[in-house]
Each structure stands twice: as structure tokens, then as C-alpha cells.
Curated annotation (Swiss-Prot):
UniProt topological domain (Cytoplasmic) ranges: 613-668, 877-962
Family of the protein in this entry: Belongs to the glutamate-gated ion channel (TC 1.A.10.1) family.
Tissue-by-tissue expression: Command interneurons of the locomotory control circuit (AIB, AVA, AVB, AVD, AVE and PVC) and motor neurons (RMD, RIM, SMD, AVG, PVQ and URY).
Segment forming the signal sequence: 1-25
CDD domains assigned to the protein according to its UniProt record, in alphabetical order: PBP1_iGluR_AMPA
Glycosylation sites: N190, N220, N275, N333, N441, N482, N852
UniProt name for this protein: Glutamate receptor 1
Keyword set, alphabetical order: Cell membrane, Cell projection, Endoplasmic reticulum, Endosome, Glycoprotein, Ion channel, Ion transport, Ligand-gated ion channel, Membrane, Postsynaptic cell membrane, Receptor, Signal, Synapse, Transmembrane, Transmembrane helix, Transport, Ubl conjugation
């Protein structure tokens, strides 16, 4: 009994210790409850949150997963009460954080539950940002991911110097907290700002009539209008009506009091002579933006113009805030939630779930009212966190003040101002930071548009850079730079130079001066640009005409013309050696398997013909002898069958043919077979031996990515690097990680360095560059590079001009005219192919070429081998026959002398072979020798008959063919 008890105790202790050692430091999942309504804003935010949650859970490096669940709360008169009931129902199953995308009374309901139960709440709507109000009614457990806009609007009004504003308030969806706006205005200016408020109609169909009536009332006054509308759908409808209004809007300036000024809206007002300003907080440079955009596009949840709306971006960032908040808690205390999950259920302070009303828990009547035991810890972690672009946020830097509001976030302000002297509105993009205001330099891309008349008296400064064959310095100008012909624009040549000449012919008074720039330009940390884009933004140039690719980052700060050339990223490798042919290349049109089958068919058909000829009575030949007897013979012996079948296969004839039906059927089938085989072989042989192929080690980007033998790289810091870095395509992401991890680095500083590396690495390095440069270099000596595979993407080269430049429309029309006439294609052929230094020659696909000895040497070897074997066989027959003659002569002789008889036989056979024939007179030695030879082998009659028939006329000729 004692030993049994001790054993059980020991087993229990070991079991307890084992359980303690295998406990995971982190919970397997964190329960997140989300609440929204059926409105478009909430649905778009939900799509983004679901995507982000799934993306986080799909990663292998995360210590815990997110158990995300969403509930739709019906709108109505009692929306606040409905929200409270919905939240309380969900909390009964357990939750560790709440997410809310609702505003108004519904938001107040969920905030009340969060505050009462100390449940962390991440809100997708902006807080009031009113310190006084939040000190009295604030929720210490709530953080808002959507930045407040009151401070920004106040700074913008002060920046513009406006003394009066009008506020158009959407009665259905309004988000602007006016008391907070006035509070910020009072702290920023001593000048009073007058404000008037107007309600928009609830029915979207009445927007047009409302605007007309509004204009009749305010036509003679300056109107600075703040539009407070949180619904993207209603806002878009309102903007369309503003854009299409027929009255003069020069005295109007609209400001969108939200962060929904999408590129689609900017394009709509680009040439409308309407003053409008908007704000944007979405960072479009990261891979996360393009991945989310692709997902939302698949689910038809994108905003206007197929862009990610601010609701989707905030939903994405709200999920990141939630995950990083819990990660921060667990990093500080990895055992924080050890008692939270038991038997796969959520427990709070020893009881399952969280109840708003403890009396409703009939399973636990003694349950007290208790808040979430970890709520304060999680709430503090939320408010103390700081994440940014590195963690994948779309709305920039995320950190919160003591009230849960966003702080230190950046906003770009797009200000479109009508210009009566130009076709397009002038555009100014300002940078603003919360707590700081407008940056000291203020301008991310600030430049005014001048009218065309301002340019007529001056030359158009055109920037370009030296990239062959777009722009090059003439060879004679390199050697003798002081020549008169090498001054100014005359020293340049190339595709872009010819394009400028064509544009000058098409555009009136387009007098240009070419200046050399350095690189295209890239965005700096402070928002400014270097390179030719920076020169354009600073006003020191009027246009950039070069191999400048059009991308969204550059499009934000400059205008591009219609593409004058389309290209894409391609792969350059060293041209492989031509395929080497073996001496038996003539056998390669048919596989080894086919050759074996032909040999088996040859033997099999020969056997079949032999058998049917033996069994068919029509193949036997009966001949009467001179003595009255009969001889029965069959021409199709085994050797003759093999010879007949081989001759048919070689398309030759023989002296024997089958006479029976069965033999002819077998022969016809074999002839048909050989006809098809020989015809197919001839066709394949002609194509094979006259087509030179180069076996490229890779043929596509997929081949390049899945191998490691050939390294590959790109030019660092250019548009190609941006393509791989921010691509959402999995294979391009893998290639980018590979290139970043290589030591020594595979990145190069210029195209010239990358091309030289391709040539010097003996086929072990591939360079990814734009197809235009690839194709051009492939036509230049030493002609040892080639392009493989299709282009990875499609991009265009365009002419860059400042925003609203008068030249943009003229350049666009000229480029379209040149495209329609085929002038641009002629220029491309001129500079890429007509001046090529390499023969069209051989490509990867192959091209026709004449036969050479290396391809058909095997045929000559077989011919020579056949001749040698034939001569050896003839020698063997000669010796064999001489030996037989000597043996017979030795047996008939009275005195046996085999050596002498062999010598005589060899001499006789040699004489016949050399002379080619002889006339033997009766009684002569030659006559007797021939008679013996006939008797021995050649004559079919017996020996006696042979001797009786040897008496013939003296002039009978016996040759070696007998």
C-alpha cells in the first residue's frame, strides 16, 4: 500500500512538473471583437481589417495569432442601445480588445461599455481632440487610429489668411468637431475668423439645385467653404456636381475637411479652374499599400479611381496597432495571460467570459460585477506604442497622446488654385506635421505654373542626361569640342534629340535649349527631390526629355506627357556559345528509341517476308534441267529477304520481287512504312542541320528565380529597384530578398557597370534592366549579350513638365500626331536597329544557316567505313576462294603440295582480278582451270555433266562474273 501510494504521488509530481515545462510563453490566439454597421465606410474598413488579420496570421514568425470576429449592428433610433447589447453579448464569449468603425451614437454606446468594463478599444473614427471635454468625459482605454483634423484645418485657415469660412455640413455623415476647430483657431491667431454653417440636403439628387441656389445667394462674395462630409459616396457625388456647375466659381475655394482627397478627385479638378484643397495621410510607397490595394480591388472595395480609401488604410493600421499592443504586453510579461484560457475557454477573474450584467449569468449566480483584469495593462501598452512605415503602417507614424489621439503624424496638403492664364490649375503640395505645423521649407513640391505667353519670349530649358541611344554627344564633337558645329544643341544626337526636333516642328515657338542633368532624381528624406526632377521643381528647367519612366511617385510632383515609348524590365545574359554538332548529328532528327524500333521493324519484316515466301506456293520456282530433271528454288532466302528489305528502306531496287499476294501485302506495308519514315526524317534533317540554336541557360524570369547558379542584380536606387522592392508579386519579392542578401552585392551603380559584369562573369551573372537599354546593347560590339524572356512589366517614357505647364497640352498633341504617323517607330528603328553593329545572325530561337562539315561529317565517315569494310570483305572472299581451289587441286593431284597449289590458285585469281576477264582456248591451262572452277562451285550441274559440257566453241568468253 505504501509503495503504491508513493508511486502515485511521484507520478503526480512528475505530471505537474511536465505540465509546467510545456506551457507556452504566449497564448495561441488573442480574441479581437469588431463592431460596425452596413454603411459603405464600415464595410470597406472591415475588408481591410480582415485582410490584415489574415496576413498577420499567415506569417510564421509571429508568436501568437489574432482571433478576429466582426459583428454588424443594425442602425436605427436606438442604435446606441443596440450597440451596447451587441457588445455585451459578444463579451460573454470573451474578448481582449474591441475595434469600432461606427461614429455618432453607436460609438458612444461602445465607448460606455469599454469604459465601464475597462476593455481596450481601438476606434477607427477620430476623437474630438478637445482637451477640456476629454478631461471630463474621456475614456482611458480608447485610442483612435484616425487622426483628428481640427488642428490641421486651423493651421490651413491661418496659412491662407482667411477671415471668414463657410461650413457645409452633411446632415447624414458629418465628422468635423467644430468646437475643437474654434479652440485651435483662437490659439493660433489674434484675428477673429467669422464662420457660417449650412446644411447640405439629405437627398443626393438635390445637390445640383442646392449649389445653384447657394451661388445665387453668395455670387458676389468670396466663399471659402469647408465641406464636412464623411461618406465617400456622398462626397464624390457632391464633387461631381461642383465640377459640373455652370456658374463662375473663381470666387469659391473648397476645402475637404477629411483625408479623402484621392488622386481621382485631384485629376477631376486639374483643369476645371476651380479652387479646391484636400488632405492625404496615406503612404503609397510601401509594399503593404499595393498588397492591400490588390486585395480590395479583387473584392471591389476600392475608393474612387481605384485607390485605397482612408477608411481602408485606417482599418489596416487599426489591426496593426492591436497586434503590436499585445506584442508589447507579452514582451514585458510573457505570463500575463496564462490564466486567461482554460479548457479552450476565456476566463476573467476566475469566471468564464465577461458579463455586463452578472445577474444574467445563471450558470454562476455568485458572479460579481468585474471589469477586464488585464484592461489597464493593455490600455497603457496601446497608448505608449510607436509604430511607423517600418512596421507596415499606411497612415504614417502612429503614436498617441494621453487622451488616445494620434500625434506627430504627417499630412500632405494638395492645393489646386485656378489660373486664368493657363489651361490647368496651379498645384501646390505642402507638408504639415501635427504639433509642428507646416515644415520650415513647407513645400514638398511647390512651383507655380506660368502661362504660355511667359515662355514665348524665352527659350524652353530642356534637361536631359547622356544615355545611349537616347542622348549622346557626337563623335566628332568628342574629338574636337571647339568646332562651331559642336556648340549648343548641335553637339547632341540620339532618339530624344530627334524627338525634340520633331516637337519643335509641331509646336509653335517651341524654342528649346538643351542642358545636361545628372540622374533622373529620387525623393529625399525631407520630401525634396534631387536630380532632374529636383531641377524641374525648383523652376530652373521647363521640361525633362530623357529616358525618364513614368511612375506614381514622380507623377505626384510633376506632370508627364503621353508616353513616347513603351518598355519594361527585362533580363540580359551573356550570349551562350552556339550548339556543337557531333559527327553523327544526322541521326538526331530521330530519337534513339525510334532508331531501335526501326531496326527491330527491319528484322521483323525480313522474317515475315521470308516466312510468307516459304509457305506461299507462288514463290517457288520450278526449272527443268537439260537431262530431264527439275530444280525447285525460292528467291527469298534469308539473306535475300534482308537485302530486299534493306533496299526498300534505302529507297533502292533489287532484282527480286515477291510474286505471291501475301508477299506483296507485306512488301507494300513495309514500303508505306519506309515512305513515311524517310519523308519525316528528311524534313526533320533539313530543319535540324540548317538551324543553329543557342541553348540559353534561362528562358524566363521564373527560370532565373528558381536557380542559384546564375546570380542576378539591378541598378540600385532606380525605378527598377522600386519595382522589386514594392512589388506584391511573390516571385519578385523573393528575387528582391535574394538580391539584398548576396555577398558580394549584386547591385550596380550604373547600367554600364551591370552590362560589363554580364560580359566578364562568363554567363554566371544576369542583369535586369529596361528593355530599351537591353536591346540597344545587344546590337553593339562585342555582340556577346542577349535578352531572354518577356518583359517583367510595362512602363512608359514620358516628357516631364511642372504642374500645369502650358507646354503639356501641346506636347501631348504633338506626341499623339507623331505616333499616328509612325514617326516615333521610325526613330526607334533608326537608333536601335538600323545602326546596329551586330549581324542579325543567330537568336535564341535559331535562324537558317548553311551546312558545314561538322554537321554531316558522320555521313562521310559511314561512307568511308562502308568502302573499307567492302574491300576487306572482297579480300576475304578472294582468300577464301583461293584456299578452296588450292584444297581441291591438292586432293586431285597425285603429289600433295598444298602450298604450291595455293600459290597457283592465288596467282590465277589475281590474274583474273587484274585483267578483268580472259579468253580460254580448249586445251589451254586457263581453260582447264576455269573448267575446274565451274565444276567446283559455279556451275549447278554435277561434275560429270560439267565435263561433258565443257566442249564449246573456241571463242567462248569466260569472265570473272561466272
Amino acid at each position: 500500500m505504501f509503495s503504491s501510494f508513493s508511486f502515485l504521488n511521484m507520478f503526480g509530481v512528475l505530471f505537474t512538473v511536465f505540465n509546467l515545462t510545456v506551457v507556452q510563453p504566449y497564448p495561441s490566439h488573442i480574441i479581437i471583437k469588431s463592431f460596425g454597421n452596413n454603411e459603405e465606410v464600415s464595410r470597406v474598413a472591415l475588408k481591410a481589417m480582415e485582410y490584415t488579420s489574415d496576413h498577420i496570421n499567415s506569417r510564421d514568425d509571429v508568436p501568437f495569432k489574432l482571433a478576429f470576429d466582426h459583428r454588424v449592428v443594425e442602425e436605427g433610433a436606438a442604435v446606441s442601445w443596440n450597440m451596447v447589447n451587441a457588445v455585451c453579448d459578444e463579451l460573454k464569449e470573451g474578448a481582449m480588445a474591441l475595434l469600432s468603425s461606427v461614429d455618432g451614437k453607436g460609438r458612444e454606446g461602445i465607448r460606455g461599455v469599454s469604459d465601464a468594463l475597462e476593455m481596450p478599444l481601438v476606434s477607427l473614427t477620430a476623437l474630438s481632440n478637445d482637451d477640456h471635454q476629454q478631461q471630463q468625459f474621456g475614456n482611458l482605454f480608447e485610442v483612435s487610429v484616425r487622426p483628428p483634423i481640427s488642428e490641421l484645418l486651423a493651421d490651413f485657415i491661418v496659412h491662407k489668411g482667411w477671415g471668414e469660412v463657410l461650413v457645409l455640413i452633411d446632415p447624414v455623415h458629418a465628422s468635423l468637431h467644430l468646437p475643437s476647430l474654434w479652440r485651435h483657431l483662437r490659439t493660433r491667431t489674434n484675428t477673429s475668423v467669422k464662420a457660417s454653417m449650412f446644411d447640405l440636403p439629405a437627398d443626393e439628387k438635390q445637390f445640383e439645385a442646392y449649389l445653384m441656389q447657394f451661388n445665387m445667394m453668395r455670387n458676389n462674395e468670396t466663399n471659402r467653404i469647408l465641406i464636412d462630409c464623411a461618406s465617400p459616396k456622398r462626397l464624390k457625388k457632391l464633387l461631381i456636381n461642383i465640377r459640373s456647375a455652370q456658374f463662375n466659381q473663381a470666387n469659391y475655394h473648397y476645402v475637404l475637411a477629411n483625408y479623402d482627397f484621392l488622386p481621382y478627385d485631384q485629376e477631376m479638378f486639374q483643369n476645371g479652374n476651380i479652387n479646391i484643397s484636400g488632405f492625404n495621410i496615406i503612404n503609397k510607397d510601401g509594399r503593404e499599400y499595393w498588397s492591400l490595394k490588390k486585395h480590395l480591388k479583387t473584392s471591389s472595395s476600392l475608393g474612387g479611381g481605384d485607390d485605397v480609401s482612408v477608411e481602408a488604410a485606417v482599418g489596416h493600421d487599426a489591426m496593426l496597432v492591436t497586434w503590436h499592443g499585445f506584442a508589447k504586453c507579452l514582451q514585458a510579461n510573457d505570463s500575463l495571460f496564462h490564466g486567461t484560457f482554460r479548457h479552450r475557454r476565456f476566463f476573467n477573474r476566475g469566471f468564464p467570459g465577461i458579463y455586463c450584467d452578472p445577474l444574467s449569468d445563471r450558470s454562476h449566480p455568485n458572479r460579481p460585477f468585474s471589469s477586464f483584469e488585464h484592461g489597464k495593462t493593455i490600455g497603457v501598452a496601446f497608448r505608449n506604442m510607436k509604430i511607423g512605415h517600418k512596421e507596415g503602417t499606411l497612415t504614417g507614424n502612429i503614436e498617441f497622446d494621453r487622451f488616445g489621439n494620434r500625434k506627430n503624424f504627417d499630412v500632405s496638403i494638395v492645393d489646386l488654385v485656378s489660373n486664368t492664364k493657363a489651361t490647368f490649375n496651379s498645384k501646390e503640395v505642402l507638408a504639415w506635421r501635427q504639433g509642428v505645423g507646416f515644415f520650415s521649407n513647407r513645400t514638398v513640391a511647390q512651383h507655380s505654373r506660368k502661362s504660355q505667353n511667359d515662355h514665348k519670349d524665352n527659350q524652353v530649358i530642356v534637361l536631359t542626361n547622356l544615355v545611349a541611344p537616347f542622348v549622346m554627344i557626337k563623335r566628332e564633337c568628342l574629338e574636337m569640342a571647339n568646332l562651331t558645329e559642336c556648340q549648343g544643341n548641335n553637339k547632341f544626337e540620339g532618339f530624344c534629340i530627334d524627338l525634340l526636333k520633331l516637337l519643335a516642328d509641331k509646336i509653335e515657338e517651341f524654342n528649346y535649349e538643351i542642358k545636361l542633368g545628372t540622374k533622373a532624381g529620387s525623393k529625399q528624406a525631407d520630401g525634396s527631390w534631387d536630380g532632374m526632377i529636383g531641377e524641374l521643381l525648383s523652376g530652373r528647367a521647363h521640361a525633362v526629355v530623357a529616358s525618364l519612366t513614368i511612375n506614381q511617385e514622380r507623377e505626384r510632383v510633376v506632370d508627364f506627357s503621353k508616353p513616347f515609348m513603351t518598355t519594361g524590365i527585362s533580363i540580359m545574359i551573356k550570349k551562350p556559345d552556339k550548339q556543337e554538332f557531333s559527327v553523327f548529328s544526322f541521326m538526331q532528327p530521330l530519337s534513339t528509341e525510334i532508331w531501335m524500333y526501326i531496326i527491330f521493324a527491319y528484322i521483323g519484316v525480313s522474317v515475315v517476308i521470308f516466312l510468307v515466301s516459304r509457305f506461299s506456293p507462288y514463290e517457288w520456282r520450278v526449272e527443268e534441267t537439260s537431262r530431264g530433271g527439275f530444280t525447285i528454288s525460292n528467291d527469298f532466302s534469308v539473306y535475300n529477304c534482308l537485302w530486299f528489305t534493306l533496299a526498300a528502306f534505302m529507297q533502292q531496287g533489287t532484282d527480286i520481287l515477291p510474286r505471291s499476294i501475301s508477299g506483296r501485302i507485306a512488301s507494300s506495308a513495309w514500303w508505306f512504312f519506309t515512305m513515311i519514315i524517310v519523308s519525316s526524317y528528311t524534313a526533320n534533317l533539313a530543319a535540324f542541320l540548317t538551324l543553329e540554336k543557342m541553348q540559353a541557360p534561362i528562358e524566363s524570369v521564373e527560370d532565373l528565380a528558381k536557380q542559384s547558379k546564375i546570380k542576378y542584380g539591378i541598378q540600385g536606387g532606380g525605378s527598377t529597384a522600386s519595382f522589386f522592392k514594392y512589388s506584391s508579386v511573390q516571385i519578385y519579392q523573393r528575387m528582391w530578398r535574394y538580391m539584398e542578401s548576396q555577398v558580394p552585392p549584386v547591385f550596380v551603380a550604373s547600367y554600364a557597370e551591370g552590362i560589363e559584369r554580364v560580359r566578364s562573369h562568363k554567363g554566371r551573372y544576369a542583369f535586369l534592366l529596361e528593355a530599351t537599354a537591353n536591346e540597344y546593347e545587344n546590337t553593339r560590339k562585342p555582340c556577346d549579350t542577349m535578352k531572354v524572356g518577356a518583359n517583367l512589366n510595362s512602363i512608359g517614357y514620358g516628357i516631364a513638365t511642372p504642374f500645369g505647364s502650358d507646354w503639356k497640352d501641346h506636347i501631348n498633341l504633338a506626341i499623339l500626331a507623331l505616333q499616328e504617323r509612325g514617326e516615333l517607330k521610325k526613330l526607334e528603328n533608326k537608333w536601335w536597329y538600323d545602326r546596329g553593329q551586330c549581324d542579325a545572325g543567330i537568336t535564341v530561337d535559331g535562324s537558317s544557316a548553311s551546312l558545314n562539315l561538322s554537321k554531316v561529317a558522320g555521313i562521310f565517315y559511314i561512307l568511308m567505313g562502308g568502302m573499307v569494310i567492302s574491300m576487306l570483305a572482297a579480300l576475304g572472299e578472294f582468300l577464301y576462294r583461293s584456299r578452296i581451289e588450292a584444297r581441291k587441286s591438292n586432293s586431285n593431284s597425285m603429289v600433295a603440295n598444298f602450298a604450291k597449289n595455293l600459290k597457283s590458285a592465288l596467282s590465277s585469281q589475281l590474274r583474273l582480278s587484274v585483267e578483268g576477264g580472259a579468253v580460254a582456248q580448249p586445251g589451254s591451262q586457263s581453260h582447264n582451270a576455269i573448267r575446274r572452277q565451274q565444276v567446283a562451285a559455279f556451275l549447278p550441274a554435277n561434275e560429270k555433266e560439267a565435263f561433258n559440257n565443257v566442249d564449246r566453241p573456241a571463242n567462248t568468253l569466260y569472265n570473272t562474273a561466272v
